[in-house]
Amino acid sequence: MSLNAEIKAQIVADNARCANDTGSPEVQVALLTAQINHLQGHFKEHSKDHHGRRGLLRMVSQRRKLLDYLKRKDVQRYAALIAKLGLRR
């Protein structure tokens, strides 16, 4: 159900602000988006997995909080991230 290490490393490399950046809001949102997209396929097959859906909703909520934080701190970085990931807003 989780992403493998190579995919995570690629996502971090694509969204990092500097060389060893793994904790910036951009990286965290990109990782959460990849996990959410991965889980959507799971729920198409397993529609009655309510326990897993709770985890998915928690991830969506965490992503929303990080996006709100980024929007408060730097609107330009927020807009660039939304465009890059193809999220609605």
Curated annotation (Swiss-Prot):
The keyword Secreted does not apply. Keywords: Ribonucleoprotein, Ribosomal protein, RNA-binding, rRNA-binding. The keyword RNA-binding applies. GO terms for biological process: translation. It holds the Pfam family Ribosomal_S15. Part of the 30S ribosomal subunit. Forms a bridge to the 50S subunit in the 70S ribosome, contacting the 23S rRNA. This is Small ribosomal subunit protein uS15. It comes from Aeromonas hydrophila subsp. hydrophila (strain ATCC 7966 / DSM 30187 / BCRC 13018 / CCUG 14551 / JCM 1027 / KCTC 2358 / NCIMB 9240 / NCTC 8049). The gene is rpsO.
